[in-house]
C-alpha cells in the first residue's frame, strides 16, 4: 500500500486462484502489502509474521513457520520480489525464525491495475482477531484460520458482479468455490457464517 494513504490491500486474482501457493497465500500477501515501506521493501521475521497473523510460531518440519517460508519461496519464483533472501536455504536450514530479513517488492505485481479483491484494513483487523470478535457467538471456530477467511473474502471480492444499476453480488456454488481456491465446501460454509457476523 503505497504512501500508507490507502486503507486497503489489493489481492491479485492470480494469487487468489493459485492453489499451489497453499491456503496461506492471501494472509502473507496481505502482510507484505500492509508492511510495505515507502521504498517498496518489507523487513520481517517469520516469528513476527506468525504474531501478526495471531498464530504461535513453530519452526518444526511442516509447521507454520515452514509453511510461510514455502509461500514466500513460491512468490519469489513467480517474480513477486525484485530481491529476497534464499528462502529455499531458509527452509532447509530451519532458519532462526526471529531473524529479520528483507524483500524488495516487484511493484508491477503488487500495484495491480485490475482483477483483484480488496480487503480493507478494518476488515483485515477483524479477521485477524476473529476469535475475539466472535467470542460468545454460537459459531463453530474449531480448526478455523484467519488465512481461510481472508482467502474466501478475497475470492468473493474478485468475483463480485459489477453491473451498473444492480446490487453487488457474488453468485457461486460452494463446490465451484472449493474447486477454484482449494478450501473444502464444509469450511466455505463455516466461513460464510463467520463473514455474515462481520
Each PLM stretch: what is its role?
Residues 1-23, 37-41, 90-143:
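Positively charged, structured surface patches that bind polyanionic biopolymers
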Residues 4, 25-27, 64, 96, ...:
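A general marker of short, structured functional hotspots
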Residues 7, 28-30, 67, 77-79, ...:
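Intrinsically disordered, low-complexity N-terminal regions enriched in serine/proline/glycine
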Residues 10, 19, 31-33, 46, ...:
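Intrinsically disordered, low-complexity regions enriched in small/polar residues
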Residues 18-41, 47-50, 139-165:
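Detector for short helical micro-motifs
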Residues 34-95, 158-198:
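Winged helix-turn-helix DNA-binding recognition segment
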Amino acid at each position: 500500500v503505497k504512501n500508507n494513504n490507502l486503507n486497503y490491500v489489493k489481492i491479485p486474482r492470480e494469487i487468489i486462484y493459485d492453489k499451489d501457493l497453499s491456503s496461506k497465500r492471501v494472509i502473507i500477501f496481505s502482510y507484505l502489502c500492509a508492511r510495505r515501506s515507502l521504498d517498496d521493501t518489507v523487513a520481517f521475521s517469520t516469528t513476527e509474521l506468525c504474531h501478526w497473523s495471531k498464530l504461535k510460531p513453530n519452526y518444526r518440519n511442516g509447521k507454520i513457520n515452514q509453511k510461510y517460508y514455502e509461500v514466500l519461496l513460491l512468490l519469489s519464483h513467480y517474480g513477486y520480489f525484485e530481491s529476497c533472501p534464499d528462502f529455499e536455504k531458509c527452509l532447509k536450514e530451519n532458519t532462526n525464525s526471529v531473524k529479520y530479513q528483507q524483500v524488495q517488492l516487484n511493484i508491477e505485481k503488487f500495484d495491480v491495475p485490475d482483477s483483484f479483491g480488496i480487503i480493507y484494513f478494518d476488515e483485515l483487523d477483524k479477521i485477524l482477531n476473529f476469535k475475539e470478535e466472535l467470542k460468545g457467538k454460537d459459531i463453530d471456530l474449531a480448526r478455523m484460520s484467519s488465512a481461510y477467511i481472508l482467502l474466501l473474502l478475497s475470492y468473493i471480492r474478485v468475483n463480485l458482479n459489477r453491473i451498473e444499476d444492480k446490487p453487488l453480488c457474488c453468485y457461486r456454488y460452494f463446490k465451484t468455490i472449493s474447486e477454484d481456491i482449494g478450501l473444502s465446501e464444509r469450511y466455505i460454509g463455516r466461513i460464510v457464517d463467520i463473514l455474515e457476523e462481520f
